[in-house]
């Protein structure tokens, strides 16, 4: 159970780093907030690259495939919290399907 908890925490940290980093770059470029925002985004994206290496599963492909589902759900949540985005039912259904896929890929008994 602790291994699963560790894995979930690492997925959340990875999502914050990647989504936050991409959002900072977006703000720097699209919203013309400047190079400091872009630089902070690049650093956050670099941190994301390291976080996945701490996952307990040794398979890069499995971790990144599962993280894709976390990214989908996390991006929608980021939009709600940070940008005032309101997902519709299809967004929520899609995110739920993605998270179910994460659970199967990462935590199914092998």
Swiss-Prot record:
GO cellular component: plasma membrane
Keyword Transmembrane part of the UniProt annotation: yes
UniProt keyword annotations, A-Z: Cell membrane, Membrane, Transmembrane, Transmembrane helix
Membrane topology: Multi-pass membrane protein
Stored InterPro entries: UPF0060
One Pfam family hit: UPF0060
Keyword match Transmembrane: yes
Compartments (UniProt record): Cell membrane
Main location (coarse class): membrane
Transmembrane stretches, start-end: 8-28, 34-54, 63-83, 89-109
Family statement: Belongs to the UPF0060 family.
HAMAP family (UniProt xref): UPF0060
Name this protein carries in UniProt: UPF0060 membrane protein SACE_5620
Organism: Saccharopolyspora erythraea (strain ATCC 11635 / DSM 40517 / JCM 4748 / NBRC 13426 / NCIMB 8594 / NRRL 2338)
């Amino acid at each position: 159970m602790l291994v699963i908890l560790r894995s979930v925490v690492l997925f959340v940290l990875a999502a914050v780093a990647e989504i936050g980093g991409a959002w900072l770059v977006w703000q720097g470029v699209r919203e013309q907030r400047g190079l400091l925002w872009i630089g902070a985004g690049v650093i956050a994206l670099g941190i994301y690259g390291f976080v996945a290496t701490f996952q307990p599963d040794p398979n890069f492909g499995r971790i990144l495939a599962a993280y894709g589902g976390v990214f989908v759900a996390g991006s929608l949540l980021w939009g709600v919290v940070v940008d005032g985005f309101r997902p519709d039912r299809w967004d929520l259904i899609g995110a739920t399907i993605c998270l179910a896929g994460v659970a199967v890929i990462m935590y199914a008994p092998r």
